[in-house]
Structures are given as structure tokens and as C-alpha cells.
Amino acid sequence: MDNLDLIADEVRKCQKCKLWKFRKNAVPGEGNSKAEIMFIGEAPGENEDIEGKPFVGVAGKLLTRLINEILGLSREDVFITNLVKCRPPNNRDPEEDEILACSPYLTRQIESIRPHIIITLGRHSTSYLFKKMNMKMESIGKVRGKFYTWNIYGYKILVFPTYHPAAALYNPPIRKVLEEDFRKVKEALSSKPITLDNFLYGSGDKGEKGNSNSGK
């Protein structure tokens, strides 16, 4: 099993795609190596590129508040990372070749941590994991707010898509939905394992209808 520090060192030295030419710092991710909850975003932004840490800008502050105030946890209790570990120029969307080159690091992180719940933030990380689960990705607004079961590495991970915090910064309705989604995760965490099935909708569920905003 990979050590997270080893993976992080590889990420910082990585030149597998063109993004290394533009970065100040690669951003491997950080948090608890035995976290029950893992957050996966899209890619680092300007602040993350400067500091080499995930979600430290304005969107990151919102994520931290949601973790603290709704989940009742600290950033040190969870693990936070991105699908792509280097900042795309001008914060553009990651390109397919960049995702292909970088995603093996994420796969190894998931295998090392073995979280109980993965919260995908926005359409890019959600789409990537849905492909891994052999599921069709609709808009983030349609699939968010539900748990999907991913049987991988010989055990079960619950994947929970929601909006990227950046999509909620200047959109009060999306922020409200994001907060509601975090409350669902809190409720699941507070439930006994036998009742957790109440929150599972399985791979056949397409998610409730919602705002079709890209949600980052």
C-alpha cells in the first residue's frame, strides 16, 4: 500500500503533463491518512498554487466552515485533495490528457486512505468517479445530494457528489443546497451502520432533479 508522503513527493516532482511548466507548487493534498471522509475537488487555484495546499482560497474557507460547523470536524480529521494536482493556466478546466496523467495519484491516495465516504466537489471529480463506477454522469445538479455505492479494493466506499464551494460563493441558492448536502453527510455519520442504508440509493439511482448549474 502506498504511503501518502511518498505519493506527495512524486506529485511535487511530476512532469507527466504540461501543467508542471506553469505551476509554482504542485498540490498533492493534505489531511488525516486514516480519514473516514475524503474530499475531492477539481484542481488547485491561484492561492493553492502559491501555498502548495488544497482549498486555501475563498472557496476553501467556505469548505472549512462547512466541515467545522456542519460536520463538526476539523480539516485535520478529513483528507482534502483534487483530481488534478497542478493549477491549470487562468483556472481553466482540466483537460482530458491532464486528468489521464494525474488521476493515478488520486487512485493511489484513495487506496491508501480507504475512506468510508468520498465527497466529490463539482462535476469534474464527480464525472471521474462515476466513470470508475461504470455510471453515467448527468449534470451535478441531478446527481448531487445522494450516496452511491462503489465496491472497490474489496470493500465499499460511499460516494457523495455535491457542488464545488466556488459555485456557492456568489449564488445563495446553491450555497443553501450545499449546506443541506453537508447536513445529509452529518446525518449519515451520526447514524448507526445498520441505518446507513437509509441513505443509499445505489448505482441505479440517477439522483433527484436539481439545478443544472455546472457547479464547477
Swiss-Prot record:
Optimum temperature is 65 degrees Celsius. It is an enzyme of class 3 (hydrolase). Keywords: 4Fe-4S, DNA damage, DNA repair, Hydrolase, Iron, Iron-sulfur, Metal-binding. Transmembrane segments: none annotated. GO terms for biological process: DNA repair. SMART domains: UDG, UreE_C. It catalyses: Hydrolyzes single-stranded DNA or mismatched double-stranded DNA and polynucleotides, releasing free uracil. It holds the Pfam family UDG. Coiled coil: none annotated. GO terms for molecular function: 4 iron, 4 sulfur cluster binding; metal ion binding; uracil DNA N-glycosylase activity. Its EC number is 3.2.2.27. The keyword Hydrolase applies. Uracil binds at G41, E42, A43, F55, N82, H164. Interacts with the sliding clamp PCNA3 subunit. Belongs to the uracil-DNA glycosylase (UDG) superfamily. Type 4 (UDGa) family. Removes uracil bases that are present in DNA as a result of either deamination of cytosine or misincorporation of dUMP instead of dTMP. Can remove uracil from double-stranded DNA containing either a U/G or U/A base pair as well as from single-stranded DNA. This is Type-4 uracil-DNA glycosylase. It comes from Saccharolobus solfataricus (strain ATCC 35092 / DSM 1617 / JCM 11322 / P2).
